[in-house]
A protein has these predicted regions:
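Right-handed parallel beta-helix/beta-solenoid
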Residues: 49-92, 551-557
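Extracellular/surface-exposed low-complexity repeats and stalk/linker segments enriched in Gly/Pro
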Residues: 551-582, 601-611
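N-terminal extracellular ligand-recognition/capping segment immediately after the signal peptide
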Residues: 90, 94, 98-123, 127-140, ...
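Extracellular beta-strand/beta-solenoid scaffold signature
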Residues: 135-145, 164-176, 191-204, 218, ...
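Short, surface-exposed terminal/edge motifs of secreted or surface/virion proteins that either
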Residues: 56-71, 579-609
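Parallel beta-helix/beta-solenoid
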Residues: 121-131, 143-191, 210-213, 249-254, ...
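N-terminal secretory signal peptides
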Residues: 1-17, 25-28, 37-41
Length: 611
């Protein structure tokens, strides 16, 4: 025997010895599955088979216990009796997930009861023909419930081919997350009422929902069948997470045609849900780079979230209420793309009387910064942005762009009594109005450096119901409005450095309660545009209308206002060199800042000293 042949034989013998040691150490004999020493029994001894259907046993499983197993290895499959329909695999499958930490689903599995995953750090993955489906009595239960921390579900397929669902009671669905630090990734969910949920009863922390497909999602609303029904607002979601520290990214959600579903992607905090609130409850949500399409009532939503990012998401059309919505949130940053295409004939959830919009803020919000792009599609009636309900204070900043290809009567912004609303660098095109506003005494609205190209059918910015409040417009551009500004009954109004073109009037004003400033504006029309104040030409408020180009107004002080030391003219905003028109036939110049400083008539040199 040569040296090479001898070395080769030694290597083969060495491998045989190593393999024998591995097999001996892993051998399991008998139904108890206890490990034995290598010389305890002949090598041909076989484990005692378990009785057919015995509880807690896996029929047909060999006697070697490993950390990893597959459903094909355990002979778990629902199509074993093809002629009589699917077999219930619940008992064997539940036992398998309790025994194995690393599990591959590579066969069709059907269950009639929720399977609970109780092993910490368990990993379950799908391959080949692996799929989990519910049997007929699971119209109100989830296929899997994760009850142990750090559970991972990868590459699985879940299907609800019988379209099981319930309008009340328990929810049909794919995965319920009742543990922390869990992940659902690269899975397919078909025809689910509630694909993935982390319920409020637990409040999961550190959840990751990444790169999944939620297809043909179902809803529990009655749609057009019953417009008086309020069903469907507690279920019918692709993903809903009640908890904190959640990341949802890279997912697709498509609603089944004709369904009245609730939400594609939803994150909600837990204020009041826990007796002792943890530091991280209802905080820190990332919702990024997801896509949603179809008749969900809203595609992307956050509720009661303190500290969230919604960015890079695309609402692809079909949302029946709102493309994105922010409800009772705080400290939220938003930058998404919304295509709003719901037909005005689709009235899903009409009993709730939703104000339809591409973007909505609801109830109350603080520190919400929205910088999204919006397209209102052909044939659609909706706002670009709306304060849909107002039960508290809204503190919101809005920017981005909005294009209206829908009804010519559409308005870009519906601002219903926001406490603090800032519009910065917003570009709108094709709308009838830039903004429809209702005010109260606590409202403050500012608009800075915005561009509005309107379609010639409505006012630019219009207060439809006013009772005080403050409106400031600075550096905006308005084109194609019948009247650029119709702003009655506000407390303080300032319009400065603004350009208006292709309009019939610059402004219609009335009922200004405290102060009015219209300065340094420009109208680039063939003829000057009127600024009309319907309460008369001499309002007893602090006002300044000056430095404007292409704007004509009949604002003028009276002799009584000029001579009274207590008039607003003398008490507020008086400065040396200020000139005012008096009775529309004389110009007076202030000779000082004090209320009693005299006024000089430039033509006659007459001096009037207030007293």
């Amino acid at each position: 025997m040569s040296i090479n042949e001898k070395a080769s034989e030694e290597r083969i013998n060495s491998r045989r010895k190593a393999l024998s040691k591995i097999l001996v150490s892993a051998a399991a004999l008998g139904t108890l599955g206890s490990l034995t020493r290598a010389n305890a029994a002949p090598a041909s001894a076989a484990p005692t088979p378990a009785p057919e259907g015995a509880a807690g046993k896996i029929n047909g499983a060999p006697g070697i216990i490993l950390d990893h197993a597959s459903t094909s290895w355990a002979k778990i499959r629902s199509d074993i009796h093809r002629g009589n329909g699917p077999v219930d695999n619940y008992a064997a499958f539940q036992q398998l997930v309790e025994d194995k930490k690393y599990l591959t689903i590579d066969t069709p599995v059907s269950i009639n009861k929720t399977v609970k995953l109780n092993l910490k750090n368990q990993i379950i993955e799908g391959r080949g023909n692996g799929i989990i489906t519910p049997l007929g009595n699971m119209g109100n239960g989830f296929l899997l419930e994760l009850t142990a921390d750090a559970t991972q579900i990868h590459g699985m397929v879940f299907d609800n081919p019988m379209l099981l669902k319930s309008e009340t009671g328990g929810r049909q669905g794919g995965i319920m997350i009742s543990a922390n630090f869990c992940e659902v990734s690269n899975c397919y969910f078909y025809r689910m009422l509630q694909s993935v949920i982390a319920p409020a009863s637990f409040g999961a922390y550190g959840t990751k929902i990444t790169n999944n497909w939620f297809l043909e999602c179902l809803g529990a609303g009655t749609g057009m069948r019953d417009l008086r029904s309020k069903l469907g607002e507690d279920r019918g979601d692709a993903v809903t997470i009640w908890g904190s520290g959640t990341i949802m990214t890279g997912n697709h959600a498509y609603c089944k045609a004709g369904e009245d579903a609730r939400l594609a992607f939803h994150a909600e905090g837990l204020p009041g849900a826990r007796k002792h609130v943890r530091d991280f409850d209802h905080k820190d949500i990332i919702m990024a780079n997801n896509m949603a399409k179809g008749s969900f009532r809203r595609h992307f939503a956050m509720e009661n979230i303190n500290g969230g990012i919604s960015i890079g998401n695309i609402s692809m059309g079909g949302a029946t209420w709102w493309g994105e919505a922010y409800i009772q949130c705080k400290n939220i940053n938003v930058k998404n793309t919304i295509r709003y295409s719901n037909s005005p004939d689709i009235l899903n959830g009409n009993a709730w009387r939703p104000i339809k919009a591409a973007i909505a803020v609801v109830n109350f919000n603080e520190g919400v910064n929205i910088d999204s792009t919006v397209l209102i599609a052909k044939g659609t009636k909706a706002y670009g942005f709306a304060i849909a309900t107002q039960t508290g204070d809204h503190d919101v900043t809005l920017s981005g762009s909005m294009i209206n290809e829908g009804a010519r009567t559409n308005t870009a912004l519906f601002l219903n009594q926001p406490k603090s609303f800032r519009i910065n660098n917003l570009d709108t095109r094709g709308f009838s109005r830039a903004a429809q506003i209702t005010t109260n005494e606590d409202v403050t609205i500012t608009s800075n450096n915005c561009y509005h190209q309107l379609n010639g059918t409505g006012k630019g910015v219009e207060v439809v119901k006013g009772s005080g409040g403050n409106i400031t417009i600075n550096g905006d551009t308005y084109s194609g409005a019948t009247t650029a500004f119709k702003l009655p009954n506000v407390a303080n109004l300032s319009i400065q450095n603004t350009r208006v073109s292709d309009s019939e009037r610059f402004a219609e004003l009335s009922g200004i309660k405290q102060s009015l400033m219209v300065t340094n504006n420009m109208c680039t029309t063939d003829q000057s545009l009127p600024l009309v104040y319907s309460d008369g030409a001499a309002p007893d408020i602090s006002w300044s209308v000056e430095g404007n180009i292409g704007i004509r107004s009949n604002f003028s002080c009276t002799s009584a206002q000029l001579s009274s030391i207590n008039s607003h003219l003398n008490q507020r905003n008086k400065h040396a060199g200020k000139n005012v028109s008096v009775n529309n036939n004389a110009v007076y110049v202030a000779l000082g800042n004090a209320p009693d400083a005299p006024w000089l008539n430039l033509a006659t040199q007459k001096v009037v000293k207030p007293a």
